[in-house]
Amino acid sequence: MTLVKIGPWGGNGGSAQDISVPPKKLLGVTIYSSDAIRSIAFNYIGVDGQEYAIGPWGGGEGTSTEIKLGSSEQIKEISGTHGPVYDLADIVTYLKIVTSANNTYEAGVPNGKEFSIPLQDSGHVVGFFGRSGTLIDAIGIYVHP
């Protein structure tokens, strides 16, 4: 099974965040936000068949957005913005996630430079990587094409 790493989008602040076991299936995502994306956590099944709980990366305050994917539901599109907030040069300010079941989830406030990753055909998001300190500085995705 091919795995593609796309991104990240955002700034260079914070520390690098990544997963150690390649992902096979994304189970759910939790995002905390306010004027920016404050934290992200997610659960996935690895290529080894084990379930992994990752994060939260960043801080946990703000409004919670919970995404629990159905057994055949997948993330088909992710978009958002990144830019200066809170005297920080470049952080992720907004995320919009669309699933194969046409569920749309939004977190944060659109502000800054836009990015969009619509996935073609059977492509779907199976995990995340990026940079974080007290907020999410940058975000990227793992995709099965």
Swiss-Prot record:
Keywords: Lectin, Repeat. Gene3D superfamilies: Jacalin-like lectin domain. InterPro entries: Jacalin-like_lectin_dom, Jacalin-like_lectin_dom_plant, Jacalin-like_lectin_dom_sf. Residues 6-64 are annotated as: 2 X approximate repeats, Gly-rich. Residues 3-145 form the Jacalin-type lectin domain. Sheaths and roots from mature plants and seedlings. Sequence repeats lie at residues 6-15, 54-64. Induction: In response to salt and related osmotic stresses. It comes from the Eukaryota. SUPFAM superfamilies: Mannose-binding lectins. Pfam families: Jacalin. GO terms for molecular function: carbohydrate binding. This is Salt stress-induced protein. It comes from Oryza sativa subsp. japonica (Rice). The gene is SALT.
